[in-house]
């Protein structure tokens, strides 16, 4: 996709598509000065996930994780009419990309375990798949805003960690 996207009448030039998730497309955009991530909510079916109001769920999850102290890109603007979210851009490769290059820092696991120490007592899990994490400046950022009710089979130790090895299998979604 080329061209522009808007949030509350502010126009952003699309640099590239960063990825597609269960709930939206994320684009790297610029206002001519700064780069951002603009997430455009989509309503495509997902066979293993039920959505209600996707935009409100995303905003609720962001606020929940922010209050817990999870390192994430800041939410900068919301356009409810267009279902667009503007986020801070965290520059760098995802953990998934780094793992494919054979790069793994033990501190990343420690930082995820620290996140788990905040999430589990609150009864929550996040999507631990490595595409959702970017190390930048010594901090591991969770770049998704999704969180779900805690279930042991989906926690980091029982599900997520299998993807955090250099030989991690591809996730099929």
Enumerate the language-model features and the residues they cover.
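Hydrophobic residue at the +6 position relative to the catalytic HRD Asp in the kinase catalytic loop
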Residues: 128-133
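Conserved alphaE helix
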Residues: 107-115
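C-lobe/activation-segment region of protein kinase-like
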Residues: 108, 120-125, 136-173
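Conserved structural core of kinase catalytic domains
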Residues: 70-108
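ATP-binding glycine-rich loop module of kinase domains
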Residues: 15-17, 22-56
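Protein kinase-like catalytic core scaffold
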Residues: 36, 71, 85, 141-143
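The N-lobe alphaC helix and its flanking beta3-alphaC-beta4 segment of protein kinase-like domains
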Residues: 50-68
């Amino acid at each position: 996709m080329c061209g522009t996207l808007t949030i509350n009448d502010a126009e952003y030039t699309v640099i590239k598509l960063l990825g597609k998730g269960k709930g939206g497309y994320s684009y790297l955009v610029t206002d001519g000065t700064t780069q951002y991530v603009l997430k455009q909510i989509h309503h495509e079916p997902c066979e293993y996930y039920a959505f209600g109001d996707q935009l409100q769920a995303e905003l609720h999850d962001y606020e929940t994780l922010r209050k817990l102290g999870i390192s994430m890109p800041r939410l900068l603007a919301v356009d409810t009419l267009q279902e667009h979210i503007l986020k801070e851009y965290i520059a760098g490769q995802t953990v998934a990309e780094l793992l494919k290059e054979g790069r793994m820092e033990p501190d990343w696991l420690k930082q995820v375990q620290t996140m788990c120490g905040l999430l589990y007592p609150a009864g929550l899990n996040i999507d631990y798949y490595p595409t959702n994490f970017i190390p930048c400046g010594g901090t591991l950022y969770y770049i998704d805003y999704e969180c779900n009710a805690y279930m042991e089979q989906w926690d980091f130790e029982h599900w997520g960690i299998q993807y955090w090895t250099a030989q991690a299998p591809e996730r099929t979604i």
